[in-house]
């Protein structure tokens, strides 16, 4: 969407030019790099110590940008390996997703974004709410609370947060249609 493109452009054009040759306390600091396998250039990686983020003028400016965009729900921070399951699921607006161990919520945020992805790439096209939804569960009360807090950044009427032992969830048989339109059953556990 246009917000995502604006954030990528901001990283490339507003912040990256100033982060390429940064030195802090006599050491070169590596700039952020794009994660090549993530679609649409939307994921970045950087490994910068906290004192560099807070004290280097160049990185402090980036840090303020990242904190603000995280607070308003435009970006999420997570390990690259945690980005894989939602990508591999290839969630569409009509899908029903059950995440049994969802906290702290970064993968859930990624799933919500996928669920709400536009049905058309036309910028002015009407995109209704998705028909699908996500049930995000965590059995630990404190972690479930953290999940609710994270979910508030991405308000979606298509999200249900639960706090139960995942082994108590019922087995579900869900019909799935394949590319030729036939339906078969997969047991979800």
What do these predicted regions represent?
Residues 1-189:
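S-adenosylmethionine
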């Amino acid at each position: 969407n246009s917000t995502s493109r604006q954030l990528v452009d901001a990283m490339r054009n507003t912040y990256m030019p100033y982060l390429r040759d940064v030195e802090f306390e006599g050491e070169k600091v590596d700039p952020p790099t794009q994660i090549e396998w993530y679609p649409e250039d939307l994921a970045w990686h950087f490994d910068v110590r906290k004192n560099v983020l807070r004290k280097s003028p160049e990185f402090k400016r980036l840090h303020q940008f990242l904190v603000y965009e995280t607070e308003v729900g435009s970006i999420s921070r997570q390990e690259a390996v945690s980005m894989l399951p939602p990508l591999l699921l290839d969630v569409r607006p009509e899908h029903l997703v059950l995440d049994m161990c969802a906290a702290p919520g970064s993968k859930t945020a990624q799933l919500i974004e996928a669920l709400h992805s536009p049905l058309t790439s036309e910028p002015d096209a009407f995109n209704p709410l998705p028909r699908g939804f996500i049930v995000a569960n965590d059995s630990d009360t404190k972690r479930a609370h953290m999940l609710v807090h994270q979910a508030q950044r991405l308000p979606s009427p298509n999200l249900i947060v639960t706090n139960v032992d995942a082994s108590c969830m019922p087995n579900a048989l869900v019909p799935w249609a394949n590319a030729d339109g036939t339906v078969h059953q997969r047991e979800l556990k």
